[in-house]
Amino acid sequence: MKSAMTALALSVGDPSGIGPEIAIAAFLAREAVGLPAFYLLADPALIASRASRLGVSVPIVETTPALAAQVFARALPIVPLAARFIDSPGRPDPANAAGTVEAIDRAVAACLAGDAAAMVTCPIAKKPLYDAGFRFPGHTEYLAHLAARHSGVEAMPVMMLAGPDLRTVPVTIHIALAEVPKALTTELIVATARITAADLAGRFGIARPRLAIAGLNPHAGEGGSLGLEDEHIVRPAVDILRAEGIDAFGPLAADTLFHARARAGYDAALCMYHDQALIPAKTLAFDDAVNVTLGLPFIRTSPDHGTAFDIAGKGIARPDSLIAALKLARTLADTDKKAAAA
């Protein structure tokens, strides 16, 4: 059982990126920003080395998940990994891949065992992982694999970008724009919307979520004159969702979907492709947008940026998005717990 004293698990990400230093910076700002307790899954020597490079003093205590919340007020709790890292900021090394993956594995296991209220992931880079034999497209797909392996639940992970004023969900994600019309199906839209509505209700505490469904084509196709996908694929999905009692409406023209008055009318916007979802989310909340993975049997958030190898180790990386991810993970965990007890 996840109690109020159960800390969040934070995986360190690629140690050559900014993950270690934004974790340090977030911890040092914990009192000023009201940060919930977390423990870092990492190599303690890496964190000490990075703090030294940055010229900052951070107290570190090696601990267990059960004791992390008690430690957090006085020191950065680190649950040590078996792997050891090479501290090479800005220079990714496949030798660090095993530890990067171990941190993710242990965060998932902690969530499923009740040893973490939720997991937050610092950014990873695909190439050093691929060079070491990792064969998953990215974080999200690997998390779905782990969820199935640990719990027997086949998960369909759904990506959400959540900011203070907007939540967006891309139905198709990391594929070329030219491939989107072929990948987009009524069934995929319906499945994505169902998961979004369920998590908005269960974890975000929104009793009757309102889903705005964006059209694929300019002006949502203008009745078929600018493409048939909105009439033949998107609109049938909306009809199915409404028949199921989900408050979905659309297809809506994307060019007028994200201004303030429009945003007041929905709780999340389902977008048909990656940039349709991420451009408005990052424009409105570049520093504090959070990536939330819906549809998993545990809560996972992450900062909405990458490893930033170009600035790693220079002391200029901002922890804002990680702080937002930690806070949102705590909120979602608390809401999920209340919903489960109701």
From Swiss-Prot:
SUPFAM superfamilies: Isocitrate/Isopropylmalate dehydrogenase-like (SSF53659)
Cofactor detail note: Binds 1 divalent metal cation per subunit. Can use ions such as Zn(2+), Mg(2+) or Co(2+).
Main location per the UniProt record: cytoplasm
Reaction equation(s) it catalyzes: 4-(phosphooxy)-L-threonine + NAD(+) = 3-amino-2-oxopropyl phosphate + CO2 + NADH
Annotated binding of substrate, by residue: H139, T140, K282, N291, R300
Keyword presence, Oxidoreductase: yes
Enzyme Commission (EC) number: 1.1.1.262
Compartments where found: Cytoplasm
Entry keyword annotation includes Zinc: yes
Any one of the GO BP annotations: pyridoxal phosphate biosynthetic process
Chain segments annotated as coiled-coil in the UniProt record: none
Positions contributing to a divalent metal cation binding: H174, H219, H274
Highest taxon, organism lineage: Bacteria
One GO CC term on file: cytoplasm
One GO MF term attached to the UniProt entry: zinc ion binding
Enzyme class label: oxidoreductase
Keywords: Cobalt, Cytoplasm, Magnesium, Metal-binding, NAD, NADP, Oxidoreductase, Pyridoxine biosynthesis, Zinc
A Pfam family this chain is assigned to: PdxA
Record function comment: Catalyzes the NAD(P)-dependent oxidation of 4-(phosphooxy)-L-threonine (HTP) into 2-amino-3-oxo-4-(phosphooxy)butyric acid which spontaneously decarboxylates to form 3-amino-2-oxopropyl phosphate (AHAP).
Subunit organization: Homodimer.
Misc remark: The active site is located at the dimer interface.
Protein name: 4-hydroxythreonine-4-phosphate dehydrogenase
Gene source species: Mesorhizobium japonicum (strain LMG 29417 / CECT 9101 / MAFF 303099) (Mesorhizobium loti (strain MAFF 303099))
Top-level taxonomy: Bacteria, Pseudomonadati, Pseudomonadota, Alphaproteobacteria, Hyphomicrobiales
